[in-house]
Amino acid sequence: SGLFADAELVKPVDHEGSFFNVKGPLNLPRFGKTRIPLVQAGASGAGRDFASSVADAIFASTPDKAAAADLRADLRKRAEQRGRKGDDIRVLPGLSLYLAPTRAEAEELFAETNARVSRDRCLATVLEMTGLDLCDWPAKRQVKATDLPPPPETVRSRTHSQLLRRMIERDEPAVEDLLCRPEVIGSAHWLVVGTPSYAVAQIKDWAAAGAIDGFVAFPGGSLDAVRLLLEQVVPALGD
């Protein structure tokens, strides 16, 4: 109909409830372009098809540079097959950042943040994501590709499941090493633990390799990590 809203019906929210009060509406300026960017979350086959057909960007888990580069190349190819340009779709992976003035402090921050993750929880994550029950396996036993059962029919994150299975197929880690992997104790997102300068170098390296177009930052462990991201990493990336 071309009618966006009936001005006579637009009024302040003026909500007052048990948990919060808000006058409304949102006090942010309108987006400066004619069309709001569309972002797809997730990199399953269906998600890639959808993103390559309509999205401006995709947010996905890419725990290593090779996975990110493969995803970006695949999305650009799919976009071109659908009559779009490769540059029409951008890859913005999640980036978990544990930042501190020294590498040792950053590693300590990461360890402290994840210290409460129990072995039972890690075992449950592996079982849920891969269908593999490691409860009775010796710590030093290797987990091989041939040990993996067929993928579970239902998983919380199909992308996470695929990434974890791919890592096992590639690295064949020992049980104790698998249970310490970021994909198991945290998430399958790209992880950087170190100084701001190290983070900048890693980001620039991934960008130069054609693995990313940007990233969605998750500074973790402390407010100092947020400060270091905003005050040192972001300005350095703009140089």
Residue ranges and their predicted role:
Residues 62-65, 218-226:
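Glycine-rich, proline-tolerant flexible connector loops at the mouths of alpha/beta enzymes
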Residues 47-50, 101-102:
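Short helix/loop capping segments that flank catalytic or ligand/cofactor-binding pockets
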Residues 35, 50, 201-204, 218-221:
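Active-site and adjacent substrate-binding regions of carbohydrate-active enzymes
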Residues 38-41, 57-60, 89-95, 215-217:
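Hydrophobic faces of well-ordered beta-strands that scaffold small-molecule active sites
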Residues 70-76, 223-238:
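C-terminal helical cap(s) of enzyme catalytic domains, especially alpha/beta-barrels
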Residues 52-64:
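A conserved active-site cap/scaffold subdomain adjacent to cofactor or substrate pockets
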Residues 38, 51, 106, 206, ...:
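Conserved, mostly hydrophobic/aromatic
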Residues 1-32, 66-70, 77-207, 238-239:
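An alpha-helical appendage that flanks or caps ligand/catalytic pockets
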